[in-house]
Amino acid sequence: VVSAPHGQTLGGGLEVCLHSDRTVAAGETYMGLVEVGVGLIPAGGGTKEMARRLVSPPLHAAPDTPPLPFLQKAFEQIALAKTATSALEAREMGFLTENDRIVMNADHIISAAKREALDLADGYTPPEHANKVYAAGRNTRAALEMGIKTMQWGHYASEYDGVIAGHVARVLTGGSLSLPQWVPEEHLLKLEKQAFLDLLKQEKTHERIEALLETGKPKRN
């Protein structure tokens, strides 16, 4: 599967790209996981992918490395709905890999994506999902949650922003795990689904969804 995004590539659209074999992005591609704006978290594998792409590699390379700085980056990108201003920045944020291509002229991305698909098809085998994802556990989650409280005390985040961000922190760190460990991708995917369904039951999430549909702007409640 080769994805060929251009322009706004947000939420589920980005999650399609994250799980493609290759992405061929236009230079002016604006990527972001912005689900918190409607009171939800990325639950199409987006939260899991941020842990897999931003946290797992440095911990594989140096197991004794403190995970918090890498988790902080993944957490902030989701909880603050950060959006890349270009495909180059999307690569810096982990939305694109070094193997993904950036095509500066958007008129050429379909032909470039077709070439990539044909190249990949020669001898293609589906990717294996044997690799595990680093889950930092409860202690590191507590540090992220303290950051959430600090944002609330400074009036940079509402009470419900904190609820949503808490779900993000829980998924990224592996849920109720007491100790850091490597877990299957499915572990984080189940946590994503659980958080998404829990938030979908909340009235304030409904208010955020309705506001975006009616006004085109996110509601802070």
Segments the model singles out, each with a brief description of its role:
Residues 1-6, 46-71:
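An acidic, glycine-rich surface segment that forms the CoA-thioester-binding/catalytic face
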Residues 57-82, 86, 92, 98, ...:
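Intrinsically disordered, low-complexity segments enriched in small/flexible residues
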Residues 11, 44, 84:
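Glycine-rich phosphate-binding loop at the start of an alpha helix
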